[in-house]
């Protein structure tokens, strides 16, 4: 109970600090540190008129350095849309990425652009970017899907608010960046020579690797990477293992190779099989494709 109260008190304090910063023209960094003076934050009312938010978006094709292969698909490009939300001269940036094999869940380029046009037409009704929950709830209500487009707006809005407060979000949330989990670098399925090259490129820059599996060359992939580095490895099978006994055998073998976690070992429709694998696995098993929205988590109880 104390933890819940502490979290609520932290939220209340951060909210108060943010508005204190806005009212005084101080950055939230200075308010949190108790400083009495700081560079001007931004002018809420430059021209005597309350500013409105504006949204812009720019579709483009992201070209990859290497062919990127997962269990069911290979690609050399990714359809993308850059999203910008501007408020009083400050711009927050977001991105909608639509890998072809996930477009049923995330949306296509056409559907993303159509949804962002809807948002562009209505976002001006909000004059306060700090109403994050209200704005994002309203945008979510505009359609049942369009996850990629909604994510891009969410990211851009948070980026905007962080810039308005002149603070990164780990500070706004009261976190210690030194305690943040390490991010992974993903290595797609490929030939041994290419996998070896990719591993050499990234091994000195990251604390943990993420490796795509789910095809017949899974063991060759891991053996090749292990010939280059002994870094911890997270595995993402992208639903590629169809048989639960095969999946469990692979997980036991992977544990011997220093793998630390397994992501989405089997198709999301095979919930009973995934639950069986999770219950037997010597490594933690995480969902990926099985969770697109918060409501999906309920269906994964005990899985």
Region locations from a protein language model:
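Acidic, glycine-rich loop-and-beta core segments that form the ion-binding/anion-interacting portion
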Residues: 238-279
